[in-house]
């Protein structure tokens, strides 16, 4: 009886895993879009005395960009816990055209001009996704 139960349990588990895996396969369109993604991390050091104003501006531009720009998949600002004036922003754009369009939007230009004096340093780090098949699962907008 125990062997029979174990057999059916394993059969059910394998079937569930196979069904679940097939739902996660990327379509050709999704795979093509993933190949065109612009994924970067902005590393920002904020000048002393400007942290609150910078955080508000970063939150504002991130929210407006994701809400209003179809090619902006993610703009996710984060603050480093042990270094509050150190900000990291994960940026994901559908393609280079979406990124270039983002740079021309009124909300980005306002953010850029309004925070120039607040930023001590800025470095943009280009990256490659290691698990592109996870993108549709993580980002519903994708």
Which residues does each predicted region cover?
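An amphipathic, aromatic/His-enriched active-site/gating alpha helix that lines ligand/cofactor pockets
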Residues: 64-74, 92-127
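Short amphipathic alpha-helical segments
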Residues: 50-72
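Short, well-ordered beta-strand segments in beta-rich or mixed alpha/beta enzyme
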Residues: 37-45, 74-103, 141
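Positively charged n-region of N-terminal signal peptides that target proteins for export
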Residues: 1-5, 21
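Non-catalytic surface loops within mature trypsin-like serine protease
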Residues: 46-48, 95, 128-130
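C-terminal motif of bacterial Sec signal peptides marking the signal peptidase cleavage site
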Residues: 15-18
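Glycine-rich beta-strand-turn "strand-cap" elements at beta-sheet edges
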Residues: 20-38, 76-83, 112-142
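Sec-dependent N-terminal signal peptides
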Residues: 5-13
């Amino acid at each position: 009886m125990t062997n029979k139960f174990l057999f059916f349990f394993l059969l059910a588990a394998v079937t569930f895993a196979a069904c679940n895996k097939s739902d996660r396969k990327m379509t050709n369109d999704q795979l093509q879009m993933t190949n065109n993604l612009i994924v970067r991390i902005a590393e920002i050091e904020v000048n002393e005395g400007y942290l609150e104003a910078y955080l508000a501006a970063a939150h504002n531009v991130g929210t407006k960009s994701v809400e209003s720009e179809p090619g902006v998949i993610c703009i996710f600002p984060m603050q480093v816990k042990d270094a509050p004036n150190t900000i990291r922003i994960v940026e994901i754009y559908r393609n280079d055209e979406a990124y270039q369009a983002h740079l021309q939007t009124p909300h980005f230009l306002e953010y850029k001009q309004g925070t120039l004096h607040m930023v001590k340093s800025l470095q943009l780090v280009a990256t490659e996704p290691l698990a592109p098949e996870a993108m549709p699962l993580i980002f519903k907008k994708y």
